[in-house]
Structure formats: C-alpha cells, structure tokens
Amino acid sequence: MKNTVLIGGILCASLLASAAVAQEKKIVYASYLSPQHITNPVLEDFFRAVEKDTDGSIKFESHVGGSLLSGRDIPGGVRDGVADAGYFVGSYIPSEMPIDNYIAQFSLWNSEPLVMTGVLNELELFDCPECVDEYRKFNTKYLASYALTPYVYHCKEELSTPEDFKGKRVRGVAAYGDLAKALGAVPINVSPDEAYEALDRGILDCALHSVAAQKARSYGEAAKFVILDPLGGFLGASTFNLRIEKWNSLTPDERAAITKHLPDLVTGAIFNYIAEDEDVKKVYSESGTKFYNADPSFAAAVEEFKAGYREQVIKKGASMGVKDPQAISDTIDRLIGKWRKLLDENGRDKETYARLLNDEIFSRIDTQNPIE
C-alpha cells in the first residue's frame, strides 16, 4: 500500500512537472547587433521583466552578434521559424521590404530622436496599413523600435568640405546613399557591423552611424575623425518583432506582459543612445579621436540636398512599389507635429516619455485577440 501511494505521488509530481514544462513558451530572439551594443542590456531587462510577469511561462533565448542570423537573414529567419523574434532592418533587403526601406528615406529629417521614436512606433502599429501588410508577408507582427540619434561620418582622414568627399567610399544606405552621391562620394551598402571591417581593410573611407558607434561598433579603432554635423538619425530598423504564430500561441495575459514592458524597452534604448553619444565624445576625444564640425560649406551642401530631396523621396517610393507614398509622407508630418506638441507640453524626462509611449501607443495594442 505504501509503495502504491509512493508511486502514485511520484507519477503525480512527474505529471505536474511535465505540465509546467509544456506551458513554458520559449521565444528565440535574433539580432545582428554586436554583443557590446548599448541596446542589448535594455533588451535583457525587457526579457527578464516579461519572464517575471508571466511567472516563467515565457522564456527568452537571445542570440546577438549575428550568431543565429545575419542582419539580412533575420526577417526571413523569423518568417520561417528559425527564430521567433528579431531585429529587422528593411534597408538590407530593399526589394523584399520596400515600405520599410521607404520610411528609412525620411531619416534625414530625424533631428529629434524622441519625437521620431514616437512617430515611428505610432506609424508602424496604427497609421500605416502598408507597413502592417509588409510585416504580414514575413509572418510577423511589428511591436517596437526607436529612432536613432543623428548619424555622422566617421572617417579615416580629416574631411571638411564637399570637395573632400569626391571619390571617397562612404557607407550609404537608403537616403544616405543618395546624399553620398550628391557629395560626389561612392555609397557602399554595408551593415553597421560590417562597416568596421570595411574601414579596417580600406574598403570604406567613412562609416556612417551615431557618435556612439565609436565604441559600440568599434569604429574608434579604425576611424579617428568624426564630423559632428548631424545627418538625421536612421529610421529603418525595428527592434522587436514577433512571428504571428508565436504571438497567437500566447495567452492574452502573456501578450499583455509583453506590451506592458515595451515602453521601457523603447525608452531605455533611445535614452541610452543619447547618453552614450555624450560619453563617447568625452572618452574618445581623450584617446585620440577628433570630433569636429566640418567647413560651413559641408552643412550648406547637406541642407541644399535635403531641400530638394523630399519630392524625390515620394517619387522614389512609387518606383519602389509603395502604393501611396504621399499618404505615408503626410502621416509622418502629422505625427511629427503631434509628438513635438506632446513633448513640449509634458516634458522630455525618461519617466514622462515612457508614460506617453504607453498611453499613446503600446496600451492600444490588441492583446485579447489572436491575429487572424
């Protein structure tokens, strides 16, 4: 009798343990960002917060540095189930993600990353049917991203005038490729992490990214001249996207746990970038990098290019296959006005910003119903 009770107890415990394992849902996340990138700690905080709020029913497995999928392969890898979630950059696969690549063309006008982060998320989630459809083609739900701090040129030699750029090979994706051509340079489409090796091997004369890339992407080891004239922050990336089958497999409470922590993920990422830009300037100027403003003729050339480029962007969108590029352009302008006003009226501190993101965007995501 005692043996029967003992065996029964063991079987019961075993079944309960099996049920707990069966209920655990693993989300495999893929990113090409280097392991030392400043966004990774924020993502890890996000993963831990979701795991805690779901009592461990959701578990994240994170692969960074392209260890599972390269930047170009992540969208297809999430679609095909190699990963469940990932960091997408449509500009790396422009023919497959023309809408995302079109939005990236507006990067030159991103002079306020807090404003444009709000714009980007509200646009993608609620105000751009073409955007939603494009992600659906990858069997994916867009969930969150951030607009980068202004891109600048990181060069191997000191360049100052437009004339200095003639014939130089510079990293140029989306609108930045056209800007490079306008300066007489040769645009090279490489990922931010590939740019370091390209600098080191002499394939690139100038990389293009935020100031923080001196550290985050090791540009400071190969490019000691950073032109501080801002070129707008890149808009063509999305930080957290989830395969639709995985989203649908979650309970409403599990989905809500994810959306609850998206404001802190986005806020942490963009505020990290802003702080890191300033810290890097201080530290790397002491170790030999020159941070400087170019000759006024350089800024004038950039502004002249921007003035005539907006109309070209819309025409370019049509040629990319965007159904209504004018509507997306108009929506971006409307949302810029909305978010600039929100921040002017409420403040730009970290806590306020996260609250605004939640109230205006992430709390509106439908977590109760699966995606049909």
What label would you give each PLM region?
Residues 12, 23-115, 142-372:
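N-terminal secretory/targeting leader peptides
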Residues 110-137:
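Short, solvent-exposed loop/beta-turn-alpha elements that line the ligand-binding surface or hinge
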Residues 8-16:
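Bacterial N-terminal signal peptides
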Residues 16-22:
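Sec/Tat signal peptide C-region and signal peptidase I cleavage site
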Residues 1-8:
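Bacterial N-terminal signal peptides that target proteins for export
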